[in-house]
């Protein structure tokens, strides 16, 4: 490769930090920005190039920061904007780069836009979100990822609002040009500060079919496939690239929920001018959790299926560039999922998985803690969990008088909280963050 054609993010290793669980600097039991600053030399010593932070914006924390109430402010538990500016300077001083999460499928219901929107149908912010007025009778069936229905009734406007996730995460209306311009302006704010890119959360979901055809969870169990790739999705991403992304030397990676082999190149093909990378959900689909699914080896996965998945994704990306991962904040720990976390095999399995990630074509993504072989915690009480998806699903099973013990056993393998426990800075067996739960 010619020196002047080298693209920095193609040669990078990305280190993902879930801030709440990483390093606590003030003893309140919550990881924070100053804690991350104190660990930058350690991070640099790992040989990584890019730090990706999960959401650090102001949030009421219904979904651990993925419900944003102010895109231009820092969550108080994490610190201040001055702390962030110092973090960014210290990152760059070590020749590292910093990318943030971009969460623009939805906001928090405490965001000023939604607070204004629910005052009146005549309020200019009303059209920033998706609504179904009572005059149109009951809204079409739309299951939520976190709740039974993706519609919640608002008495102030006498209309239901749409939320694919929690009812405290109303979905933005990307058909509204003002919404898109507001998002682009916010992105410029962070790029002008000097950040080096965005990981884009749930990006295939931002475009909605305004007719809202009914979705029956029994007929369409894969809601991501049902909700992704709405009208004008690629027009929006191309517009975002033209208006914002192309103006900066940055990297972008999209969360590729429901993106198939046939569709991935539409997002990352160089001629498309949309995103740089997209990570698919293949690793989450290869792993089996029932003996019926994997009768030969019990709870496990097929090595052949794993190979086919990665080979297929690499081929489908074409002239684009793959994002390579085996775990993140939404998945169980990769060692417990794809390796063997028993003490006698843990080190060997962790090194094997690391070798796999680092020898594939593409940019590898590494979740903080994987480098020391962190495993699933295997919680056995619902009170140990903080993930809204786990908690809401448990309530639904209780309501139906289902088997909650079976559910808890499955959550030991599948819950997002498996990847969100405190970073183990020593071998004491206690959380690094004093007072943390």
Predicted regions and their residues:
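Active-site and adjacent substrate-binding regions of carbohydrate-active enzymes
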Residues: 1-437
């Amino acid at each position: 490769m010619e020196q002047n054609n080298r693209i920095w993010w193609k040669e990078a290793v990305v280190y993902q930090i879930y801030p709440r669980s990483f390093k606590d600097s003030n003893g309140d039991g919550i990881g924070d920005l100053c804690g991350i600053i104190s660990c930058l030399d350690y991070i640099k010593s790992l040989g990584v190039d890019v730090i990706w932070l999960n959401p650090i914006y102001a949030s009421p924390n219904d979904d651990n920061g993925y419900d944003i109430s102010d895109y231009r402010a820092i969550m108080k538990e994490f610190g201040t904007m001055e702390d962030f500016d110092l973090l960014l300077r210290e990152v760059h001083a070590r020749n590292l780069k910093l990318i943030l999460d971009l969460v623009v499928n939805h906001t928090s219901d405490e965001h000023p836009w939604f607070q204004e929107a629910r005052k009146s149908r005549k309020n200019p912010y009303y059209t920033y979100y998706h609504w179904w007025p009572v005059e149109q009778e009951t809204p079409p069936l739309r299951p939520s990822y976190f709740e039974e229905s993706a519609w919640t009734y608002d008495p102030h406007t006498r209309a239901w609002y749409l939320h694919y996730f929690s009812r405290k995460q109303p979905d933005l209306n990307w058909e509204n040009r003002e919404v898109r311009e507001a998002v682009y302006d916010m992105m410029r704010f962070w790029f002008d500060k000097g950040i080096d890119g965005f990981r884009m959360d749930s990006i295939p979901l931002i475009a909605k079919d305004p007719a809202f055809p009914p979705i029956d969870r029994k007929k369409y169990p894969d809601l991501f496939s049902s909700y992704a790739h709405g009208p004008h999705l690629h027009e929006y991403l191309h517009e975002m690239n033209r208006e914002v992304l192309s103006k900066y030397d940055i990297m972008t990676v999209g969360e590729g929920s429901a993106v198939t082999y046939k569709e991935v190149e539409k997002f990352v093909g160089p001629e498309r001018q949309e995103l740089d990378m997209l990570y698919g959900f293949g690793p989450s689909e290869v792993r089996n959790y029932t003996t019926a699914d994997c009768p030969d080896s019990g709870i496990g996965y097929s090595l052949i299926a794993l190979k086919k998945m990665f080979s297929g994704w690499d081929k489908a990306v074409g002239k684009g560039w793959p994002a390579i991962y085996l775990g993140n904040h939404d998945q169980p720990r990769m060692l417990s999922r794809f390796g063997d976390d028993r003490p006698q095999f843990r080190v060997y399995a962790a090194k094997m998985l690391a070798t796999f990630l680092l020898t594939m074509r593409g940019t590898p993504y590494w979740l903080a803690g994987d480098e020391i072989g962190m495993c699933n915690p295997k919680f056995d009480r619902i009170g140990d969990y903080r993930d809204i998806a786990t908690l809401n699903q448990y309530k639904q099973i209780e309501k139906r008088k289902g088997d909650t013990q079976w559910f808890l056993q499955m959550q030991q393998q599948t819950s997002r909280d498996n990847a969100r426990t405190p970073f183990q800075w020593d071998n004491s067996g206690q959380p690094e963050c004093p007072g943390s739960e």
